[in-house]
Amino acid sequence: TTTTTTTTMTMTMTMTTTRTTTRTATTTTRTTSTSTTLTRTSTQTTTQTTTPTTSSTTTTSTTRTTTVTTTRRWPWVSLFCFSVVRTTGYEPILLGAQHEKRASIFDCDEHMVFSNEEASAGEWNVWEHGNLKTIDHVPIEVQVTGMGDLSKPGVTTNSFLNTKVFLKAWDLLIKDGRFWEHDWVVKVDPDAVFFPDRLQDRLKPLTSYGLSEGNAMYIVNCDRQFGAQDTMPAKLFGSLEVFSRNAINAYAHGGAQRCQQMDWKGWGEDYFMQMCMDLLGVEQHADFKMIGDDRCHAASCFDQERVAFHDFKDAAGYFKCWYEAMGPQGAEDHLAQVRADRLARQERVGEVEVLPSASAS
């Protein structure tokens, strides 16, 4: 006599998603918490066999239940953005104007600002909560060494030889650690008119939902050839540098030391990062319509396909381009939302706050 009993538990999946958006004058916080619980099949089979000799055999096999839970703090696709700013010249003023209108990196999910030295109070002034204060930033204790001279051996740029400053910025960003919770890390030049929402849409096909998944990848954004000696068909231009979290993971875990063994002293920081990513085996993804850059291929600020436009070194020119790219209604809607968010904060904390004007200029 053979008796078989089989019990099968079916798969159960429960997903709960909560989205909360909070904006303040200094930061924009978008929180998405998605908890997914997957319970897989559990099967228990008992077989009993009885023979005429009265011998009996019982076999029991059990597959235990497995529960997998995945939680995201930030929305998909999330951006951690940063800028490195020189404390003299136009950049602090330009950054203050961006901060007021919550433009560029200040509209990313999280952001950081680094400077090449401590800034005086007058250079970083912005109105916030009714007080004149300075933008929070992290000073870097190294100096830019000057402009590159292409006539010298090993020099690859006639722009600032700023690699040492950015090496320190990357070290501080990794030490800060907040970028680990985001899908992409984005370095933005202060004079780039940058739209984070456009970049998020652009990156969706390249982004895995799970934070532990996804390829190590960076975006090359310029295909211009600079003379017969130029052998690089695709380049990383520094106005907008986009890296997946796992690309920076490769850099953070031994990659930085390997890359700093290259002969980089005559390089700009964008060329260094491209050579570094290639050395570490990070995948290139080409998007030559991502930026409109006068140093590569210029584009009209009305071009809706572009994620960023470069370069605009004064606030008037910067926000003229920003307004053209947003369109009159888009710009007014954005500024109205900024004013509403700051009024809501004022009501919560009882502070008087200077709000951005209705004009985008």
Regions from the PLM with identified roles:
Residues 1-72:
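Extracellular mucin-like PTS domains
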Residues 71-94:
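N-proximal low-complexity "stem/linker" segments adjacent to membrane-targeting elements
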Residues 81-83, 113, 187:
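Structural beta-sheet core signal
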Residues 81-84, 135-142, 234-243:
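Conserved, well-structured core segments
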Residues 97-108:
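Short, acidic, metal-binding catalytic loop of nucleotide-sugar glycosyltransferases
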Residues 112-183:
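Active-site-proximal specificity loops/subdomain of glycosyltransferases
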Residues 156-163, 167-297, 336, 344:
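Conserved catalytic core of nucleotide-sugar-dependent glycosyltransferases
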Residues 261-361:
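C-terminal catalytic/acceptor-binding lobe
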